[in-house]
């Protein structure tokens, strides 16, 4: 862990890290971009998840919802990742030692694995592709898991900003 902390300190103390942290404009721009892109990507993920669990848009085929929203979800996620990386760059050593940061990163990985499993396994099943009703329980579980994971990721991220480190 000490080598990771040393690496984080070098990132934070780099010219870029210092410039972001000390700038009157860059840090707020990156943080604002992070929050806005987070709202886009995870808001649309929630719409998708609500469809998967059968609460909303029941008459719209799952694959239609995914086809329409996927580019915006992925675009928002890329922007969230880039802006979050820039915010992290300015406070890497401070944030990295927090258990909340570790939980956030592990949950992001878990959320990604859940999405990949859904895309490459569950969404390929005939009953999903053909929009059979009711959808298999695996679809609902994937949606519930996604909603839970991403909600906790957001909570961890927001708590990082306010809890002592």
PLM features per residue range, with description:
Residues 1-165:
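Polytopic transmembrane helical bundles with strong interfacial aromatic enrichment
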């Amino acid at each position: 862990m000490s080598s990771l902390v040393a690496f984080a300190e070098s990132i934070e103390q780099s010219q870029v890290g210092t410039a972001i942290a000390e700038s009157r404009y860059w840090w707020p721009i990156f943080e604002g971009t992070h929050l806005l892109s987070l709202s886009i990507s995870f808001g649309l993920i929630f719409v998708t998840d609500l469809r998967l669990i059968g609460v909303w848009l029941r008459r719209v085929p799952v694959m239609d919802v995914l086809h329409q929203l996927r580019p915006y979800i992925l675009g928002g996620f890329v922007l969230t990742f880039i802006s979050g990386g820039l915010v992290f760059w300015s406070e890497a050593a401070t944030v990295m030692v927090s258990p909340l940061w570790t939980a956030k990163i592990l949950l992001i990985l878990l959320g990604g694995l859940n999405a990949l499993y859904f895309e490459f396994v569950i969404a390929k099943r005939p009953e999903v592709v053909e929009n059979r009703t009711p959808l298999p329980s695996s679809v609902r579980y994937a949606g519930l898991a996604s909603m839970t994971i991403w909600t906790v990721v957001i909570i961890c991220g927001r708590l990082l900003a306010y809890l002592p480190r």
